[in-house]
Amino acid sequence: MDSITTAASVVAAGLAVGLGAIGPGIGQGTAAGGAVEGIARQPEAEGKIRGTLLLSFAFMESLTIYGLVVALVLLFANPFAG
């Protein structure tokens, strides 16, 4: 693998993880804030809100994991390497 491809792969891997974590991070913060407000308004609905929140966290976190998988593929199984 030549040096340009290696450098581009490392930069792309960093961008994949970094940019792949921004959206889910913002979404998780917004969802957690909404859950806290919902529990404050209706404490008896805490169980339902918490269950829905954890499920939505799992879906949001999967986007970050996809970014990590793309980064690992670029670093260790690079399809662009000759």
Swiss-Prot record:
It is found in: Cellular thylakoid membrane. One of its GO terms (cellular component) is proton-transporting two-sector ATPase complex, proton-transporting domain. The chain crosses the membrane at residues 7-27, 57-77. One of its GO terms (molecular function) is lipid binding. Keywords: ATP synthesis, CF(0), Hydrogen ion transport, Ion transport, Lipid-binding, Membrane, Thylakoid, Transmembrane, Transmembrane helix, Transport. The record marks E61 as: Reversibly protonated during proton transport. It holds the Pfam family ATP-synt_C. It is a multi-pass membrane protein. Its main location: membrane. F(1)F(0) ATP synthase produces ATP from ADP in the presence of a proton or sodium gradient. F-type ATPases consist of two structural domains, F(1) containing the extramembraneous catalytic core and F(0) containing the membrane proton channel, linked together by a central stalk and a peripheral stalk. During catalysis, ATP synthesis in the catalytic domain of F(1) is coupled via a rotary mechanism of the central stalk subunits to proton translocation. Belongs to the ATPase C chain family. F-type ATPases have 2 components, F(1) - the catalytic core - and F(0) - the membrane proton channel. F(1) has five subunits: alpha(3), beta(3), gamma(1), delta(1), epsilon(1). F(0) has four main subunits: a(1), b(1), b'(1) and c(10-14). The alpha and beta chains form an alternating ring which encloses part of the gamma chain. F(1) is attached to F(0) by a central stalk formed by the gamma and epsilon chains, while a peripheral stalk is formed by the delta, b and b' chains. This is ATP synthase subunit c. It comes from Prochlorococcus marinus (strain MIT 9313).
